[in-house]
Amino acid sequence: FAAAAEVTPTQADDARGTVAEARTWLRELLADAVLVLPSSAGGAPARDASAETIEAERAGTLRMSCLAGLAGAPAVSLPVLRTADGRPAGLCLVGAPGTDLDLLNLAHAIEGSTA
């Protein structure tokens, strides 16, 4: 909240404009495609990971996972990947707004093919 209190009205207006441009671009991209990306910036952190490691993972994941919310688009994560060192990782599918059921059907097909 402290950081938000420092944002000026001009900065907020500029940010809203950037968000609107990004939303339009993402929706155009997703109109006839599904975005496929990792569900997180890396694999699951170790149980004994430091707070700094966990925060870095969270921040990296937030940068990637905000795309669906920014576009108002459905997304689903599938626990079907592993990192090179064997840690669990997910695959995220992002579809166009309004394609929720199609996206779930695709996720189901992918999950079935990796079982």
Task: Report the location of each language-model feature.
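Structural helix-boundary/capping segments
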Residues: D13, L70-A115
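Serine-dependent amide/ester hydrolase catalytic core
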Residues: F1-L70
